């Protein structure tokens, strides 16, 4: 089952400095945050190319229970990757519902 979160939940993870891996395949969101929150987001960022996500998670021995948040432009690519990660045994995978486009909309409404 695909776990979806929105701006409010992502913002809580960042502002609350909750540990998670952030795989951003979309536009940058660092500029939305103050320096302290930005530092947490930078530490959470798992920089990789889309085709290298699985090999890099495996190579870095990322535990299957690690919280992983995926963001892309519209949520489509992230959803496909999340399904693949879940098939491989990752149990704590989240997709930004609607991707960057929806994230911007929800942020403006907050």
Feature annotation, model-predicted:
Residues 1-20, 25-67, 73-110:
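Rhodanese-like catalytic fold shared by cysteine-dependent sulfurtransferases
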């Amino acid at each position: 089952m695909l776990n979806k979160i929105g701006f409010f939940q992502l913002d809580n993870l960042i502002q609350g400095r909750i540990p998670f891996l952030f795989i951003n395949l979309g536009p940058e969101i660092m500029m939305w945050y103050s320096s302290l929150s930005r530092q947490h987001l930078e530490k959470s960022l798992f920089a990789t190319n889309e085709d290298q996500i699985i090999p890099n998670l495996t190579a870095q021995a990322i535990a299957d229970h690690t919280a992983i948040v995926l963001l892309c432009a519209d949520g489509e690519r992230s959803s496909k990757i999340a399904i693949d990660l879940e098939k491989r045994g990752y149990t704590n995978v989240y997709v930004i519902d609607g991707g960057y486009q929806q994230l911007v909309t929800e942020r403006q409404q907050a």
